[in-house]
Amino acid sequence: MHVEAIDRLDSFEAFEALLAEPGPWIGGFDFPFGLPRSAVAELGWPLDWVALVGHCASLSRTEFRARLDAHRQARAFGDRYAHRTVDRPAGSHSPLKLVNPPVALMFLEGAPRLARAGVRVPGVCAGDDSRIAIEAYPGYLVRSITRASYKSDTRSKQTPERAEARARVLAALTRADHCLEVALTAPPDILAQAQSDASGDTLDAIVCALQAGWAARAPGFGLPDGVDPLEGWIAGVAQVNV
């Protein structure tokens, strides 16, 4: 897979404009597209994805937080967060988490925008076949290369060790030495950006694109049989791990 350029979006409006761009394109987006079916049922929310994201979008952030907080507190200690089927094998956080990281809020902002844009989300909802959105998760692929931390938003934690980890990840990507076995090519300046960006955002964007590229070439976008359309699936996570 070849990366030609990296654009940076600084607003939700810019993200909406990206989703509205005419196809054909496929994009990998690093936020949860769905919620755990068990939690949705317990909350009494719609069990259809389009209806679910519409319902969540109708709530204020305060209301959304309050519903998830109440649901979490009602669960047994040690099992506060429900997970989607894909979360355990992917090593991803429950999309109900509101902090560290606030992936529930990422769902709240991201998923309704996908629905409103009318893009196709394979395994989740029909839409414009020329504009395809895939749920990506850089952490899954990167952990097949190294378990070392490679990024931080805190300046004091942007260490030489993390820079070295980014270098190892980039080297492995160019060799296709990772779980998806797709080789990355990119101009030297883009590789340098990914190496120097201590937040990891540039490297994560590249990995998301690689996951989307892998899905574009895989039969059925690489989805296992029986994906729950309420929960969705993360690109590249193997069915055998479920």
Positions of PLM-derived features:
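RNase H-like (RuvC/DEDD) metal-dependent nuclease/polynucleotide-processing core
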Residues: M1-V242
